[in-house]
Structures are given as C-alpha cells and as structure tokens.
Regions:
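Amphipathic alpha-helical segments
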Residues: 1-21, 134-147
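Short, conserved beta-strand/beta-arch hydrophobic-aromatic motifs that form part
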Residues: 24-149
Length: 152
C-alpha cells in the first residue's frame, strides 16, 4: 500500500469502514462500512500498479479530476454500466439493476457530445495516477459521499 493509499485507508477506518479482501487475482480491498455494509472505495494494486477507486455520486459538485475520471471510465468500458437518462425528473435513477432502483445511486453526467447519461453507482470509479497530492481532495470527496450514504 502506498503512503497515499494508507492515508485514505486511515481516514476511512475513522469513519467506520473496514477493508474486505476481494477475490481477485490482484491484491485488492473493498472498504465496507461496518454498520450499513455500503462499499465506498476499493484500493490495492492491479498488475503491480497502485489502484484507487471511489464512489462519489453523492457529492454535489465533484472536483474536475473526478468528473474526468468518470467520463474516462465510461469511454474505456464502451458505455458498460451507463445508459440514457430514463427519468428526466429523477436523473440519478436508471432502473437498470437492483442497485439503482431505489434511486440516488448513480452518476449523472454529460458527454462531450452533449448526450446526458447515467452511470451506475454500484461500482467505484478508478482515479488514475493517485498520489500524495491527491489525498486532501480525496478525503473531502469521501467525507461528502459518506455523509450522503448516511441519508439513505
């Protein structure tokens, strides 16, 4: 675990999240809340490269770096877990899977071509090249996401 990952892990532990080893080839942990069971982040290494992915759909105005990471992830997966906005009055409500049918668990975003889409909130979004300089911003994002989880 890198020093940046350790700093985020310490913060998540202070909020009541615990690491749960993932059953994957690489060393990966999901950070799951002890009370609610909700996963807020995944950290570890993929192919020996440090990996940090977070959920931030509950953050009212996420930083540009996080919005860019979301759009990059949608494009990299060729739209997997994303679809058109089905309920214009309830944008974070896709209805495609059980994770989102309760509403409020998705990322609303606009592609560069102006298309409005919703990406499923069941999966954390990888943040590329995560370093020590990113820790304060990540803590702010995770604090806001945790507060949002508390309202559900």
């Amino acid at each position: 675990m890198t020093p940046a990952q350790r700093a985020v892990a310490d913060f998540l532990e202070s909020l009541g999240y615990a690491p749960v080893r993932q059953k994957v080839r690489d060393e990966m942990f999901a950070w799951k809340h002890r009370g609610s069971g909700r996963v807020i982040a995944k950290m570890g290494a993929r192919g020996g490269i440090p990996y940090v992915a977070v959920k931030f759909f509950g953050v009212p105005d996420p930083p540009a770096r996080y919005r860019d990471a979301l759009l990059r992830e949608i494009e990299a997966r060729k739209g997997q877990y994303a679809g058109p906005v089905r309920h214009p009055d309830r944008k974070a409500y896709c209805g495609f899977c059980p994770a989102c049918t309760g509403g409020g668990l998705g990322y609303f975003c606009v592609r560069s071509d102006g298309t409005e889409i919703l990406r499923c909130g069941a999966y954390p979004v990888p943040i590329p090249d995560f370093s020590d300089a990113d820790v304060p911003e990540a803590i702010d994002v995770l604090r806001a996401q945790h507060a949002y989880f508390q309202t559900l």
